[in-house]
Regions:
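TPR-repeat structural position
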Residues: 34, 67-68, 87
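Structural marker of alpha-solenoid helical repeat scaffolds
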Residues: 13, 46-47, 64, 80-84
Length: 107
């Protein structure tokens, strides 16, 4: 049984939390299924709005299809990371956001 199948089985059995949803979102994003990833990552940040890694991955999942929503996810993630003192995560999302904004300016 694959990791994704195991995580889906846990979810079906009633386990639902930020870490499980993050794991599913990450697995679906790596399986090139960003739409499914977005659904799970949104639930992850609903469970834990301070989960900066989930905000970062949500932005990545949204980047191609919904750049404005990706930017908003990264802004939320930057705020969450800064609130926790996670400077590295905040910096990474600031870089992603700047690249996205530069790309939008060129289009």
């Amino acid at each position: 049984m694959s990791l994704t199948e195991n995580l889906e089985k846990m979810l079906a059995a009633g386990t639902d939390n930020a870490l499980l949803r993050f794991g599913l979102g990450n697995a679906y994003l790596h399986a090139n299924d960003p739409e499914r990833a977005v659904g799970h990552l949104r639930r992850a940040v609903e469970h834990d709005p301070g989960y900066s890694a989930a905000w970062k991955l949500l932005g990545k999942a949204l980047e191609a299809a919904e750049p404005a929503q990706a930017a908003q996810a990264w802004r939320s993630g930057i705020a969450a990371a800064e609130a926790k003192g996670d400077k590295q995560a905040a910096r990474e999302m600031q870089v992603f956001l700047r690249r996205l904004e530069r790309g939008a300016g060129n289009g």
